[in-house]
Each structure stands twice: as C-alpha cells, then as structure tokens.
C-alpha cells in the first residue's frame, strides 16, 4: 500500500519540468532540435534523484533513489553528470542550509567558477552508485535491455536498498532512420523471423509498460525534432493536425505570433499514444549580446501536452538549469 501511495504522489521536479505535476508511471517526452539542452535537463533531474534528502545534518533536498539511464545516441558524457553533482554538493556544503532549487537574486552570474569549497567524497560516491547507465548501439540491443531491465532493477534494489524512480531514455528516436532504411532486422542469424519498424516500436512500448507495472518509475525520454521555420519571440501556442493512424509521420504546427514553425512527428503512433506528457525545448531567438547572460545560450521551453498558455526561458550553468523569465 505504501508503494502505491508513493507512486501516486506528485514529484516536484526542477525547471523546466516544474510546471506540471508528474507521477511515477508518467511518460514525459522532451522534444527539441539539437542543441536545445535536452540531455542537460536529464542530468539535472538525475542529480535531484540520486542526491539524499539529508546527509550528516546537511539538507540536500534529493529523492535518494536510483536512476536508470539508457543512452541510445551513445554521446552521453558521464563527466558532465559528475561535475554537476560535485557542484551541487559544494554549493550545499557552502551554504549549510536548504538547497534553493528556485531562482535566487542572481543565481546565474557571469562566470563558470565553482565554489571554493570541498565536498564529501563519500557522499559523492554513494550518489554516483545510484546512477545506473546502459549504452545501446542498435534497436536489437535496446529491446534486449528492456526485456532484462526488470531483473537488473531488482538486483540494484537489493544492492542499494532503494528503488529506481526515473527511467531515462536519451534520444528515443536514435535508431528510427536506420531501422526505417532497413527492410527488416534479424532476430537471430539463422532465423527467418524479422522485426519491422512498427513491431520494434510496439515491442518497446509493451516492454516499458510491463516494466512500469513491476517497477513504477517516471519515464523521461528525449527526442530530436525536425524543425522548419524559426520561431518568433512571442508567446508560443501549439496547434496540431489530426493524427493519422495510417501515417506515423504527422506534420505538426507551432505558432508564435504571425510566424509558424512546422516539425514532423516521425515516431510511430504507438509511441505517440504512449506518451502522457510532452515538452518542447529549443534555442530562443533572443540576441545574447543584448541580455545580461551574454556568455550563456538562452533556451525556451513550452508544454505541448498538457498545453499551457505560456513558456519559460532558461539557461544552463554548472549548477544546473535556471529559469530566467
């Protein structure tokens, strides 16, 4: 019963995922062109999850749970995670107070220097052990990983004494174009049985759905988008064409003032229907030279599902992602 109550409780995530209440079992798609800080958003959420709530009298405000990170585009840099974690530990150790996940008077500053304060290496090692990483090089490895993930998570739970709260999939569409170009994928070299693009997507969704029944987690999946025209700086509102079950590649339109941006939804309908929440992130068209964040790229986030009538601007620093408007 306690596990069921925990699964139903909302998770208070960090920006830009803070606008919508999320629960274990939700599937959040973080879509956007490259670069748009999608992986940085995952890293910040991962640090929040693996940090303890409290350690030796210091409040860190974390969840103290495991993160399962599946890297599909094979470009994840573990050093970025460790540096972000170290920065958070030093920042908190220096303040001695509760971590402020929201805006401070000037949390962004103008440089990239880290606080001149040490951090607890024992705590750092404990947090890093709660980050579970798997790299897949093709759809076959991805499917094999999903089919065995239930047992991996069970062993991890027995080892660490805590459950996994986040299942992160970096670049869910990484193998889409390769699989689409191939007529089929062999399950075994001596087998006639083949996997089609549609069956791959169906199996992925089915395996994740079965996994969530046994190990309730919040799924955070990034996805690269194919964009058309540029946005305007005005508030972004989304309209979309009716999904066609016969054509998995649906043209979506995002409007901003008089300008429109089209992007193609290339993922199969079975995945689109599986997603419960979707947020679009992109580089803002602000001129950095005219802002106080001259050394930082400014990004824009917009919730498409559920649709919200406003958007957030944010920047990425060593300490994480911060909303600037």
Where are these regions (language model features)?
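Preference for well-ordered, secondary-structure-rich cores of eukaryotic proteins
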Residues: 5-13, 35, 140, 147-156, ...
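Intrinsically disordered, low-complexity regulatory regions enriched in Ser/Pro/Gly/Thr
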Residues: 22, 59-63, 74, 124-126, ...
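The Walker A/P-loop phosphate-binding site
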Residues: 1-103, 110-116
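Conserved inter-motif catalytic segment of the P-loop NTP-binding fold
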Residues: 63-188
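Phosphate-binding/switch region of NTP-binding enzymes
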Residues: 196-325
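Intrinsically disordered, low-complexity domain-flanking/linker segments in eukaryotic proteins
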Residues: 56-60, 91-120, 232-259
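Helical mechanochemical/support elements of P-loop NTPase systems and associated helical scaffolds
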Residues: 26, 38, 77, 127, ...
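Eukaryotic short linear interaction motifs
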Residues: 37-38, 76-78, 140-143, 174-177, ...
């Amino acid at each position: 019963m306690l596990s069921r109550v925990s699964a139903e409780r909302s998770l208070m995530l960090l920006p830009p995922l803070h606008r919508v209440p999320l629960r274990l079992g939700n599937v959040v798609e973080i879509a956007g062109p490259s670069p748009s800080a999608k992986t940085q958003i995952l890293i910040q959420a991962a640090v929040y999850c693996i940090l303890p709530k409290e350690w030796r009298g210091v409040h860190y405000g974390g969840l103290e749970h495991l993160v399962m990170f599946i890297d599909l585009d094979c470009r994840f840099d573990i050093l970025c995670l460790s540096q972000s974690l170290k920065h958070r530990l030093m920042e908190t150790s220096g303040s001695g107070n509760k971590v402020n996940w929201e805006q401070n008077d000037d949390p962004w500053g103008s440089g990239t220097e880290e606080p001149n304060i040490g951090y607890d290496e024992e705590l750092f090692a404990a947090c890093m052990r709660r980050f579970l990483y798997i790299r897949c090089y093709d759809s076959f490895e991805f499917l094999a990983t999903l089919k065995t993930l239930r047992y991996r998570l069970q062993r991890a739970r027995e080892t660490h004494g805590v459950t996994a709260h986040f299942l992160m999939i970096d670049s869910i569409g990484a193998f889409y174009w390769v699989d689409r170009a191939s007529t089929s994928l062999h399950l075994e070299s001596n087998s006639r049985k083949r996997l089609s693009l549609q069956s791959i997507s169906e199996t992925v969704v089915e395996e994740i759905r079965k996994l969530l029944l046994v190990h309730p987690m919040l799924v955070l999946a990034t996805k690269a988008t194919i964009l058309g025209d540029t946005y305007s700086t005005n508030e972004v509102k989304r309209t979309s064409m009716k999904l066609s079950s016969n054509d998995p590649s649906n043209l979506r339109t995002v409007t901003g003032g008089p300008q429109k941006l089209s992007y193609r939804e290339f993922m199969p309908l079975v995945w689109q229907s599986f997603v419960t929440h979707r947020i679009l992130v992109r580089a803002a068209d602000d001129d950095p030279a005219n802002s106080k964040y001259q050394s930082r790229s400014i990004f824009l986030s917009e919730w498409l599902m559920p649709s919200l009538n406003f958007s957030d601007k944010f920047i990425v620093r060593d300490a994480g992602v911060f909303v600037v408007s």
